[in-house]
Amino acid sequence: VAAYAICVRDGQLLLARWTDGRGRPEWTLPGGGMEHGEDPYDTVLREVEEETGYHVEVTGLLGVDSFRLTTRSRFRRPVDRQGLRLVYEARVTGGQLRPEIGGSTDLAAWHPLETVPGLDRVGLVDTGLALWRERPVTGRLPQKMNTA
């Protein structure tokens, strides 16, 4: 289970850059996995601060993204995993933009909303933006947008 934030300010989206398993940098929403015993609400506050330097206030729960990922273990056995990602809307209340030190991301930046489609990004960015724009009452998009 993980929690992520959609932070839009002055027509720009806050994103963090991470490197995927193939060594390719991609933009993602700030956020990440829950620590044992942690509430998802607290997870998103902690993760946004760790990855961007900003303190945020959660202004709403946009939805839940459920995904299934099938990979192979290092012993070539199939591994079938399911994950849940809670996507919150948040606004910056303090702090200063800075990169994460010693973590999973190496850069944080604001991107104009109209340039996001041209970025190398993970599918969660599109899912999060669709939840933000459409605000489905169920917290679920009508059609699955991404796998991971």
Regions found by a protein language model. Give the residues of each.
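Nudix hydrolase/Nudix homology domain
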Residues: 22-24, 97-148
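General beta-strand recognition
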Residues: 14-15, 98
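Structural motif
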Residues: 13, 59, 81-87, 108
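Active-site-adjacent beta-strand/loop module that shapes the phosphate/pyrophosphate-binding cleft
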Residues: 67-97
